[in-house]
Structure formats: C-alpha cells, structure tokens
C-alpha cells in the first residue's frame, strides 16, 4: 500500500491498538511509527534522516528536529497545553507547520487543584494537619472562623479551557464569576470557545461570567472588582510576563484577594508577590508554578504559612494520556476531512 502520511509518535507511551484503529479508519493511507523516549529526555531518539524527510505529522512534547530535516512536515501535535517551549524556534517561527496544543486535557484536574487548595486555605486544613501530626486537638476559636464559597467572587485571568472549567466548578459552589481575556469578547459569538472541550465540562458558550474584561486597559479595572479569589491561567508571552506586579497587588489589597497561579510562574513578579504577602495585601496564595522554577530550597517563598506550593503538578491525572490521545485522534479525523484543526497555536500571539 502507498502511504500519503507518516506520523512519528515520539512519546514515553506507545499508541494503544484501539487508538490506532480509530485513526487508521479516518486515514487508511497514514503510517504510524512509534519511537520511545523517556519523559524528560533531552535528545531525539535515533531516527534516520530519510525517515524525518518523509514525516508529515509529529506527536511530541519537548523534542523537535531542525526544520531542515522535515521538508514535508505539516502538523505537530503537542503533549502539553502550553507552548512557550516553541518560542524562538525556527521550526515554529519560520515554517507553515501547524502546531496544536492539548488544550482540553488539563481542565478537570487543574480546576480540582484550584479549588482543593483554595478550600483547604478557607477551612484551615494546613493548620489542622499540623495539629494532627502533633497529636493535638485544638478547637476553633469560634464557629464563624471559616468563610464558605457561596457568594464569593472569582476572577479568572485567562478564560481559556482551564479557566472555563474553573468557572463551572465555581458556579457549582455558588460563586460569582468574572472573566478577563487578552482580547475583547463583546459578542456571544466571540465568547464561544474554539478549544477542544470534553462534553459536559467547561463553558463552551461563555455563559458563566457575569462580567467580562479585556485588554491591558481593563486589567486593573478587573482586579479592582472586589475579587475574593484570583485564578491565573495565562500562558507565558511577552504580554503576560509580570502581568501581576506591584501596582496590581496594590489594587488587590482592597479586598485582600487570595491568588491561585496555575499558568506560568513569571506571570507574577515573585519579588512583588513576597512584598504583598509581607505587607498583608493579599490573604495568601496557591502556586503550582513559580519563578524561578524549580524553586530553590533556600528561597524565601517556602517560608510563608499562608502559601501552598506544589511542583507544577496540577495537570497530573491518570487520564492524561487518554485525553491527549482523544484530542489527537479528533484532530487527525478533522485533518482527513479537510476541516480546521482544534487548539491551533496562533504563531503571532505565541499561544
């Protein structure tokens, strides 16, 4: 049989037979080659230059060939939702190759992380765990020492697929949702999501927010809108680096918001964050990402009792690969049908 497509599957896991059957049904003329790599491998697996020259599709995470090796490459599916690892790469910036993220894979588990850490803070769970380890029964000083989530306002900085799932969970807790996007979404059509969304999850129609904000000119207005919880889900670009800094912490101090960062560490100025914590401008923070990352053992940020830090693991799930493969198969089917790919990275914007 003559094959019109060659897919190089470069991952730490092999493609399941059921998945292969699905994609071959969509495109019988596609050949799939699996090449194993360790999760954090730094070098490409041994693949001949002849094979690279024939490849039309690549499934990878952080390993990429030089653009000169892949004259026929048309589509790269990333294992990750973020794509800042591509910035400055000629394969990304100087070609017409379509890059697609795995947006839609992470929202369930990351939204769970956001609310498990926020509710743990609200309900004093870290303190109770310390008491438990010390075998101490310490009664709360009052029955009103806990603020539940009903009626609180969550501001979601970056209303993509992760932010939309956070909104869904927030609404279930009875919270009010405000959304901020980098670009204006002032019509019902513009508020619809173009990313892959699992049925029954997220906010594909953009129905949950009671207020929308957009652009640099409305950032501080958004932060000044009496937010109880600020969730940052932004990618890292030149526009978003340091988007929450000293001026923004001053604004957030009005309500003493709690901050949750599941985007990228450099979206927050670490020095300004620590100053805000020292001065009591915010109630606390939950950080799955930091700047620097990994956070050095002697870093001051470790020492705050009102800060929860985890090692960039909020996206971990035993359904991770299953969901990524579902997104990838969906895109391969759309490609075979001549339809636009979902989660297509905008090279001009960098996400």
Language model feature labels by segment:
Residues 1-55:
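N-terminal glycine-/charge-rich "phosphate-binding" loop or analogous flexible N-terminal tail
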Residues 22, 100, 104-113, 127, ...:
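C-terminal helix-to-coil terminal segments
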Residues 52-133, 143-147:
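Phosphate/diphosphate ligand-binding glycine-rich loop within oxidoreductases
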Residues 62, 80, 232-234, 262-263, ...:
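Glycine-rich, N-terminal phosphate-binding loop of Rossmann-like dinucleotide-binding domains
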Residues 66-73, 89-95, 249-255, 276-281, ...:
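Short, conserved loop/helix-junction motifs that constitute active-site signature segments
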Residues 178:
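Conserved beta-strand positions in the Rossmann-like core of class I SAM-dependent methyltransferases
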Residues 184-300:
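Rossmann-like adenosine-cofactor binding region
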